[in-house]
Amino acid sequence: MRIKGTGKSETIVGTDSADLIDGGAGNDTIIGGAGTDTLTGGRGADTFVFCANSQYDVVTDFNPAEGDRVLLDLGGSPSTPAYSGTLWDGLSFQTAGGTCTVHCVDFNGDGVMDTQLSINGNNMFLLGCLPSQLHGWDIMGG
């Protein structure tokens, strides 16, 4: 299903199917849902919510310089960092919802390394973003 934001700051929630979500402009919160989703925040400081049941999400335009961040929805406090420090390839840390691992992979074969977050067998890929570009304050909720 294609879901398009209005260009204002909003919360956009996907379905249990495979969704293509585009937040457009604005500081959006994007929750893919249980399906295999492609998430694009657009301009603004966007928050991409990664749940333990998210299955498989790909974020196409993650940009920490714009203020983008990932929220791990695992039952912890969304204002508390799930991990404090710089992320790196092979890092593993425990959260309330399970173990989160960080990997550096070329997900789409374009020759650019991407970040893979894995929780309990579910994956989120941040295209064009290295783990070293993320810090603990970018990964919230634990």
Could you describe each region identified by the protein language model?
Residues 1-58, 116-118, 132-142:
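Glycine- and aspartate-rich repeat motifs characteristic of hemolysin/RTX-like Ca2+-binding segments
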Residues 45-142:
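Acidic glycine/aspartate-rich repeat arrays in secreted/surface proteins
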